[in-house]
């Protein structure tokens, strides 16, 4: 049923090896062992960079910067005296009302969240006396008036120069 045995001109080149008989074997540099070596080198490089990044953060010194304003410094100094006095000055100097802490599970109301954000923003802003605020506003108005006067003077000078050039 199989017919004659053909060895020299076999239809399937079973025992013939080399790139001229098999189109898949062209380019002999990327053999399986070479691919394994390349993957191993890439893996080692990846592990090296991961360790390098992980330990580079540990070598740096941690820097903690707090935003401080002049009013915050005075408020923090009064807080330290309150702590040293055992809270006796708390009853007399109640500048900052203490807010009750609410657990996160019960803090579901969106309006309450927004109000809390506003309160936190107000606490972080430096509290300026109304007199200081008025003085700042006056200074700003004076600066604007001076700038307007300077612009008008420059415009008059330009007109005078143009008239002189025209004559």
Curated annotation (Swiss-Prot):
Name of the molecule in the record: Uncharacterized protein YKL063C
Ranges annotated as biased composition (Basic and acidic residues): 1-13, 102-156
Comment field (misc): Present with 2190 molecules/cell in log phase SD medium.
Biased composition annotated in UniProt, kind: Low complexity: 71-80
Region (Disordered): 1-26, 67-167
Example of a GO cellular component annotation carried by this entry: Golgi apparatus
């Amino acid at each position: 049923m199989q017919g004659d045995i053909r060895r020299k001109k076999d239809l399937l080149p079973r025992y013939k090896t080399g790139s001229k008989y098999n189109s898949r074997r062209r380019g002999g540099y990327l053999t399986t062992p070479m691919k394994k070596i390349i993957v191993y080198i890439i893996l080692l490089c990846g592990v090296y960079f991961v360790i390098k990044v992980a330990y580079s953060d540990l070598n740096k010194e941690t820097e903690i910067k707090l935003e401080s304003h002049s009013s915050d410094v005075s408020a923090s100094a009064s807080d330290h005296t309150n702590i040293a006095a055992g809270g006796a000055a708390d009853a007399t100097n109640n500048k900052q009302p203490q807010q009750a802490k609410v657990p996160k599970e019960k803090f579901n109301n969106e309006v309450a969240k927004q109000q809390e954000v506003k309160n936190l923003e107000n606490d972080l802003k430096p509290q300026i006396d109304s007199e200081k605020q008025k003085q700042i506003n006056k200074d700003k108005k004076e600066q604007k008036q001076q700038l307007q006067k300077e612009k008008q003077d420059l415009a008059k000078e330009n007109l005078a120069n143009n008239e002189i050039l025209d004559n």
